[in-house]
Design a protein with these regions (language model features):
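A short, basic N-terminal segment
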Residues: 1-105, 259-260, 264
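Short glycine-rich substrate-engagement loop in P-loop NTPases that contacts/grips substrate
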Residues: 89-104, 135, 141-143, 160-196
Length: 266
């Protein structure tokens, strides 16, 4: 054995190399890293400084999407994935394709201006009958397969990628939290989120045959908190959100929204 090898052995270089290789294999098996960063999560920039690899950034965003309750089926989907020709089930939209194209334009417009909207700088938009109004909150109405959940999920992800705080709320789960006496702590957390988040999205809004007596009070409470925040809210329903019996807060939240009807094939 050469003197250099003896010296490396004394310093434990071989052991260090082995540990590094084992660590790399572990990261590979866990699906962490990529060939670009040699499974370390970091690369070296042109000026010689360490930079986070794109694979690590995506992992970071996935964790944020999970915390924001974004349905996993829509992770990494974007506005560009909106299909103007068919609905979610592949049914041809026919004459409604023109409406779908307008929806795509609206989503692109909203996404481009999302940062300003969350900062209280509302862009103006010309819509039906050439009416011009400032755009902040939107209420999307549509049937099953019209793309409501897709839109909800991609806009939340877009906000997160822009370093904005956003969260996706499923109506069924939200109602359960607000009407369960044992979930008061969670209900209080929801209230604080409605006060502070840059963007709140509620998907799947519908009327149930029976509503808990406390629903009106709690829904009114969080609705008023959201209105007073001055920040945008996106609502997604099958078209009967106005019929939900509750207080003035919920009705005011609905009235603050620009109502958009999505193309739908029965």
């Amino acid at each position: 054995m050469s003197e250099s090898n003896d010296f490396e052995k004394i310093l434990g270089v071989d052991k260090i190399k082995s540990m590094r290789e084992n660590a790399k294999l572990k990261r590979m098996s866990d699906g962490k890293g990529c060939t670009l960063c040699d499974y370390t999560g970091y690369t070296t920039s042109d000026n010689g400084k360490a930079a986070m690899c794109s694979c690590l950034k995506e992992q970071f965003f996935k964790e944020l999407f999970h915390k924001a309750n974004v349905p996993k089926a829509f992770w990494n989907k974007t506005v560009a994935d909106w299909n103007t020709r068919t609905d979610n089930y592949g049914k041809d939209l026919g004459a409604q394709q023109n409406i779908s194209e307008k929806i795509y334009s609206l989503l692109s417009f909203y996404e481009r201006n999302l940062g300003n909207i969350c900062r209280g700088k509302f862009p103006k938009l010309k819509h039906t009958y050439n009416v011009v109004r400032e755009v902040c909150s939107i209420h999307f109405e549509g049937g099953i397969g019209s793309g409501k959940s897709f839109i909800a999920a991609v806009i939340v992800q877009s906000a997160i990628r822009r370093n904005l705080s956003a969260k996706y709320y499923d109506w069924t789960e939200l109602i359960q939290i607000l009407t369960d006496f044992e979930k008061k702590e969670q209900a209080d957390e929801v209230l604080e989120e409605f006060k502070e988040l840059d963007l709140v999205v509620i998907d799947g809004i519908e009327i149930y045959s029976y509503n808990h007596p406390q629903l009106s009070v709690h829904l009114d409470r969080i609705s008023k908190a959201r209105i007073h925040s001055g920040k945008p809210t996106l609502l997604f329903s099958n078209g009967n959100a106005q019929q939900i019996s509750t207080g003035s807060g919920w009705n005011s939240l609905l009235k603050s929204c620009l109502t958009i009807r999505l193309p739908y094939i029965k």
